[in-house]
């Protein structure tokens, strides 16, 4: 049974990336038609602009599905209910608070979770946080360089009442402290928390940009990560070989 279970998981892992790419291909014709209808020929003639528009349309569809499959792990993480990789019902670590940097914010699919955590996991936890002198979220910077996703993110922020707390930063990680790239600047050692959810696998120059993110953290700052990782050796040879 263990072998069959491993083979089943192997087949699923082999198929999933191709299903993902197949779904993305479905949005290619509609992105072309959208640009033609809008008379946006500069997008059609620019590979980089077209890629951004295509990705924005695709992610608006697939993002909520990604959230649905991950939120049972991500929400406890942000609420401080995860310790040593184990989830529980009690708050055992500090929830996100203060100034937060959300990387790859997309269309705002996690913004409602930020709004929930901002008022505490429950009344008792909220009261405890106040007694300790800790605040909720004072500022959230959502890093989203895709123009289409950033526009949707701004609308989402207003819908859930985080306008004035959540600021959309429409540039990549490499430009977060460059006031010429956007209307603001995130200073080194000014951020309390960083949140990355299934995004570090797709950022450019990961080593350089991860180092830049670390530099933005205050001393004692916290990084909340839910990412693709190297498969556990106990999962079997086939899955490890496929990932390699």
Task: For each feature predicted by the language model, list its residue ranges.
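Conserved class I S-adenosyl-L-methionine
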Residues: 222-244
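Conserved alpha-helix/loop element of class I SAM-dependent methyltransferases that forms part
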Residues: 64-98, 109-117
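Class I SAM-dependent methyltransferase SAM/SAH-binding core
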Residues: 99-101, 106-178
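A short acidic, Gly/Pro-enriched loop at the edge of an enzyme's catalytic core
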Residues: 178-194
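A short SAM/SAH-binding and catalytic strip from SAM-dependent methyltransferases
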Residues: 192-205
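Class I SAM-dependent transferase core
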Residues: 36-82
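N-terminal auxiliary segments of SAM/dcSAM-dependent transferases
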Residues: 2-49
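A short glycine-rich, Lys/Arg-flanked "PGG" loop and its adjoining helix->strand segment in the class I
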Residues: 207-219
